[in-house]
Amino acid sequence: MNKQQIDYTQKGFTKPKEHYIYRVKFTKGEEVKFIGHLDIMRLFQRAIKRAKLPVAYSQGFNPHQLLSFASPLTLGATSEGEYGDIEMAEKIEPYIVMQELNKTLPCGVNIEKSVLITEKTESAMAAIEAAKYIVFADEKLNKKLLQNQIEQYLLQKEILVMKKTKRNEKITDIREDIFDMKNISDEYGNKIYLYLAAGSKQNLKPEVVMKSFYEFLSLPFEKYHIKYHRVDLMRNDINKGFVGLGENIGIC
């Protein structure tokens, strides 16, 4: 039966309740950088309960809060651009969602922005196409030579790496998935800006790029000496190109 033709007054049909979807942008600081993706979700579930927000629940024998999060962050990394979609059973002001959650979330997790989006808006996870990172590299890199070394690295027609899949490992060319890479080092140390493909179609992790770059320079790669910070997750806006997941989507 076509959805538009359903008569909800008939016995056996229940008209679905209207839900309101709020996209929140939040940080993941040093205090919580070793908390994994699933634990972040549980953390939000508890915070929503404590905040007494009118969250929507799934139907069935084991109802759960309707919330989802964008691309998982590498364990040990920090971020200022994490996103989640939270469905509410009642319409409330977006600033209230942000305000009340920030009262109950732990140090290191802070809601920076909240917008009400339409049901037609792609989920945060589905919309991702790119991600921006700052990499805090170790002292093996020469700050004065770094920009030239990056340019030489990117001049390669292909950059082959061994990538793990669910079943095995395979050699993959990642060159087209590196949108930008540059030296942004300062007096505090070696820093590299990365702009990479991300999401369900193509997903390139910053640590894969850095391992490949160190190998290109014939330097030992010690992964625990390098820190990663995600600046933002990006979607492709039909009018403006790549924008943050929380930009140009709010209806209030």
PLM features: residue spans?
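Helix N-cap motif at beta-to-alpha junctions
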Residues: 89-94, 139-142, 199
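A contiguous pocket-lining binding segment that forms or flanks enzyme active sites
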Residues: 134-170
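Hydrophobic, proline/glycine-rich low-complexity stretches
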Residues: 2-26, 32
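Short amphipathic alpha-helices in soluble, non-transmembrane regions
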Residues: 96-105, 146-154, 209-210
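Short, charge-patterned binding micro-sites
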Residues: 56-86
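Ordered, amphipathic secondary-structure segments that act as subunit-interaction surfaces
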Residues: 80-134
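N-terminal ordered "arm"
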Residues: 31-54
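Core RNA-modification/binding signature centered on pseudouridine synthases
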Residues: 1, 11, 16, 155-252
